[in-house]
């Protein structure tokens, strides 16, 4: 499990924008009467916690698909099932329906609550909020209007800062846990305070040496200090290592959230007018959404559509015809 998560975080450091790998797909269908149905299509994910009120679609043998119909989008949002390490990803949804005689307009929005507290290292002194958001989600588009050469010059330094933060995120988990158990170490090369002050230096060392943290997690700190004093947390088979690994899992919420890829499909009644950040294909609005979009704040999905009230046109036509007939009758 740890090796798998390290692999994911290492990939994060090398990527600007991750493609929408569908481990959990969300499908929301809005009906004309304001009711809605939520679907979750799941493949090899432990991020969905659904109770017996959800129905499983047994026809899908490749993925697990569950669904539930709600009286309103508010009720839908009040029943979350997506979670990271047991903490639900909450949302608030709203549907505005406006009758305009010939048309009925629908405006839908769903705002997913921020998980900014999952970020385990400070980033403000390395990257601005917009820069980190750009690296995580592509928004805001900081390269708008740039030429290809200008984009390359802009991305290079930004990528270096991003890789530093990604590496620090990996190392920081170990440093904090070791510091919490520093009294277990026999003859440490430095005291606890000094040890914690070296996080930047250790991170730079890992980057300069191109250290393979994935395969040699236990060797980095020992190689940096040229000491085996910290090996009790990695190499022993006793309770110290087990306790260390159990606590370590709790520090990886950032990785779990980042890797939660949840493409969001939205079906609205009538003709789609506005898709927000989504793209329209075959009448379905597709949003590339996932946990990383929540690392720096709330994330809102918006869309609007229009239903043509055919009966209103027919009725209006009949009224016009009756009015004309009445006028002609009076003149006759």
Predicted regions and their residues:
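Bacterial N-terminal signal peptides that target proteins for export
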Residues: 1-8
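C-terminal motif of bacterial Sec signal peptides marking the signal peptidase cleavage site
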Residues: 16-19
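Start-of-domain marker
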Residues: 21-75
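C-terminal membrane-anchoring or membrane-association module
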Residues: 324-332
């Amino acid at each position: 499990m740890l090796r798998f998560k390290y692999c994911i975080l290492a990939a994060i450091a090398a990527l600007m924008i991750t493609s929408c790998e569908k481990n959990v797909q969300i499908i929301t269908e809005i009906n004309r009467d304001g009711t809605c149905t939520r679907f979750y299509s799941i493949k090899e994910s432990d991020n969905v916690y659904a109770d017996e009120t959800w129905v499983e679609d047994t026809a899908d043998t490749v993925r697990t698909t569950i669904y539930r119909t709600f009286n309103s989008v508010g009720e839908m949002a009040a029943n979350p099932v997506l979670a990271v390490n047991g903490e639900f990803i909450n949302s608030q949804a709203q549907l505005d329906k406006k009758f305009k005689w010939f048309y009925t307009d629908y405006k839908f929005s769903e705002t997913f609550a921020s998980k900014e507290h999952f970020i385990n290292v400070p980033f403000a002194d390395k990257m601005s909020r917009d820069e980190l958001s750009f690296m995580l989600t592509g928004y805001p588009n900081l390269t708008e209007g740039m030429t290809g050469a200008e984009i390359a010059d802009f991305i290079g330094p930004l990528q270096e800062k991003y890789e530093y933060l990604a590496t620090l995120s990996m190392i920081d988990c170990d440093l904090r846990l070791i510091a919490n158990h520093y009294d277990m170490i026999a003859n440490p090369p430095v005291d606890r305070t000094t040890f914690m002050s070296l996080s930047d230096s250790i991170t730079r060392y890992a980057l300069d040496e191109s250290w393979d943290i994935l395969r040699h997690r236990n060797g980095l700190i020992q190689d940096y200090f040229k000491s085996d004093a910290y090996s009790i947390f990695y190499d022993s088979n006793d309770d110290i290592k087990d306790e260390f690994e159990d606590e370590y899992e709790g520090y990886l919420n950032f990785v779990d959230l980042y890797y939660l890829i949840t493409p969001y499909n939205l079906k609205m009644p009538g003709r789609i007018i506005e898709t927000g950040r989504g793209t329209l294909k075959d009448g379905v609005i597709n949003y590339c959404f996932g946990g990383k979009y929540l690392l720096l704040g709330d994330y809102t999905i918006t869309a609007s559509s229009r239903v043509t009230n055919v009966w209103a046109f027919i009725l209006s036509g009949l009224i016009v015809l009756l009015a004309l007939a009445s006028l002609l009758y009076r003149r006759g």
